[in-house]
């Protein structure tokens, strides 16, 4: 009879341990799920910021091309006005 009681007692202890481990496992699973959601949210935010950066870089390239075009146009106009001024000066000297 003592052996049966010991077996029942051991079974109860193992059941209690199993319940505790199940509870710990559930808590850890919940924490993992929370962290997973946090990381997914962080990744979404990073993706949004990367897209904003890519868009800004594209806009910057477009603006730089326009600046270069305007610089070239400005240079052309300066040369043209310089030639015109020089022609007027030459006509006055003649």
From Swiss-Prot:
Q: Which residues form a coiled coil?
A: 1-77
The region called Disordered is annotated at: 1-22
Q: Mind listing the UniProt keywords for this protein, alphabetically?
A: Coiled coil
Quick check: keyword Coiled coil in the entry?
yes
What name goes with this protein?
Uncharacterized protein 042R
UniProt lineage? Viruses, Varidnaviria, Bamfordvirae, Nucleocytoviricota, Megaviricetes
